[in-house]
Amino acid sequence: MSLTIGIVGLPNVGKSTLFNALTKNDVLAANYPFATIEPNVGVVGLPDERLGKLAELFGSEKILPAPVSFVDIAGLVRGASKGQGRGNAFLANIRDASAICQVVRAFSDPNVLHVDGKVSPADDIETINTELILADLQTVEKALPRLQKEAKLKKEKAATVAAAEAAFKLLNDGVTLYQGAGPAGIELDLLAELHLLTTKPFLYVFNVDETELGNEAFLDELRALVAPAEAVFMDAKIESELIELDEADALELLQSTGQSEPGLNRLIRVGFDTLGLQTYLTAGPKEARAWTVPVGATAPEAAGVIHSDFQRGFIKAEIVSYDDLVAAGSMSAAKAAGKVRMEGKDYIMKDGDVVEFRFNV
């Protein structure tokens, strides 16, 4: 499995600049609405220093980090669900995303127009949330007559109708399904066929002035706008500059802004955490590689991420923790120290497990 994050935001908030920095891919980043007409898709690797060390230990030719896909989606405006701007054409582009990342403008620059004429992070967040909620309302409202008709023929559909009716009420109250479904007792799995947008977790990137990156009082105000969701703060222009610099110059620039690492790295990790994902590792002469699995995945399920045959014919998993392996200095030394163990089908994977699966098909 891989993580896909849909990047949404009002026009001119720095969304495409952020995407360019993420993927080192120069999509059109222009100071006018809808510079992004079709979604740009980029795949980047989850930053993971462990892979470099594994490659050293195993003499790996290649390093393959866990992939993260970012989809840069055309700017939406107030009324998009009713056809304003580019209308709801953007909706189809984010239905397949695992999570929605809202890029919110929190910087002041008179040379960069704001679509609503003023910079207000709270208003921008409300606009985007409202458009996504309205889009889901339309989807549920359109589907309900069909679902009710099906329920008359198939009794098992009654639960789906009840879930859809409860979801409609929640959305009509201005609450996203991700936030409100649990407390309302709505089983979102029953509504999977509707591909509702607000069932996805949201995370937020605040594009702030470089001078505000160390202003904790200001950042706390922004965090409060989206709590309990995760917030990441960065200056998209700085992030764009960082990718053009060598390691020493990049570190100097980061330190000058009070940061220890690029905001992009934090964003990718927050995406993993928000979705409850983790990585396990494999290594050999050909490659050192990270694989993405949900927290709580069993060893056979993790094996299936590599190939379905691995899961179907799973026998055992030879596992050592990354820290134990590095401390030992080699796999043979880790085995001699009793740090390598054989695990069966009920084993729950841990982040940083270094694994070799044994299977028979």
Over which residues does each language-model region extend?
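Conserved G1/Walker A P-loop phosphate-binding module
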Residues: 1-111, 122, 141-142
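Amphipathic alpha-helical transducer elements in NTP-driven molecular machines
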Residues: 34, 48-51, 64-70, 84-98, ...
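Short capping/connector residues at structural and topological boundaries
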Residues: 6, 34, 39-42, 49-51, ...
